[in-house]
Amino acid sequence: MTRTFVIAGIVAVCLATHGSAQSDKQGVLYRSPGGTTLRLLLDEGNVGPEVSMAEMTFPPNSDTPEHAHGAIEMFYVVSGELEHVVNGKSEILKPGMAGYVKPPDKVRHKTGAAGAKVVAVWVPGAEARKIAARWTREP
């Protein structure tokens, strides 16, 4: 529950201090080789470099490779279930639940038959663009 309030608080502060409109760079969809999609919602184009936010959809029965980020990554599950594995410790996140990972920890995401949709937040915010740069931009 505390993690949910942390995510909501970060986003609320950024929106209150920088405005809430999307920049023309947002809303673009990116797809990973495994089929996960990322749609940028907020980034340096409107909130500055402090934070970025995206909607991510993990396809059914997906399993991302273990990886690390250069920023704090927080997830809020909107639908489905996401197995959030940090340094080998697994937690099942269901709708309404949140999880996070800090650098240099290793993270892996797995889904079941329903897949999962999450809102992801990165602090500092440049991390979302780094992820998107490695994925394919959808038309």
What residue spans do the PLM features occupy?
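Conserved short histidine dyad/triad with adjacent acidic residue
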Residues: 52-69
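A short, N-terminal "cap"/entry segment at the start of jelly-roll beta-barrel domains
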Residues: 5, 13-50, 130-139
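Ligand-binding loop in jelly-roll beta-barrel domains
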Residues: 48, 103-128
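Bacterial N-terminal signal peptides that target proteins for export
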Residues: 1-7
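Glycine- and acidic-residue-biased ligand/ion/polar-headgroup-sensing regions
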Residues: 70-82, 87
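Short acidic-glycine-tyrosine-enriched beta hairpin
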Residues: 88-104
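Histidine-centered active-site/metal-ligand motif
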Residues: 67-69, 84, 107-109
